[in-house]
Every structure is written in structure tokens, then in C-alpha cells.
Amino acid sequence: APKDDTWYTGAKLGWSQYHDT
């Protein structure tokens, strides 16, 4: 699922920035 991977990558980056830890 390429679409899933795309949203997953964005979510990972966003999560990392959102949770600056």
C-alpha cells in the first residue's frame, strides 16, 4: 500500500515534531 506508506511517513515526521522528545 504505497498510499499508506505516504501518510505513514508524514505522520511519523509530524508526530516527531509534535512530540519534540
Curated annotation (Swiss-Prot):
Transmembrane annotation, as ranges: 6-16
UniProt-annotated location(s): Cell outer membrane
Example GO BP: monoatomic ion transport
Gene3D superfamilies attached to this UniProt entry: 2.40.160.20
Membrane topology: Multi-pass membrane protein
Main location: membrane
One Gene Ontology CC term in the entry: cell outer membrane
Molecular function in Gene Ontology: porin activity
Signal peptide segment: none
Keywords, ordered alphabetically: Cell outer membrane, Ion transport, Membrane, Porin, Transmembrane, Transmembrane beta strand, Transport
Free-text function comment from the UniProt entry: With TolR probably plays a role in maintaining the position of the peptidoglycan cell wall in the periplasm. Acts as a porin with low permeability that allows slow penetration of small solutes; an internal gate slows down solute passage.
Entry note about domains: The extracellular loops are most variable in sequence, and in some bacteria confer sensitivity to phage and/or colicins.
Assembly, per entry: Monomer and homodimer.
Family membership noted in the UniProt record: Belongs to the outer membrane OOP (TC 1.B.6) superfamily. OmpA family.
Protein name: Outer membrane protein A
Organism of provenance: Actinobacillus lignieresii
Highest classification ranks of the organism: Bacteria, Pseudomonadati, Pseudomonadota, Gammaproteobacteria, Pasteurellales
Gene: ompA
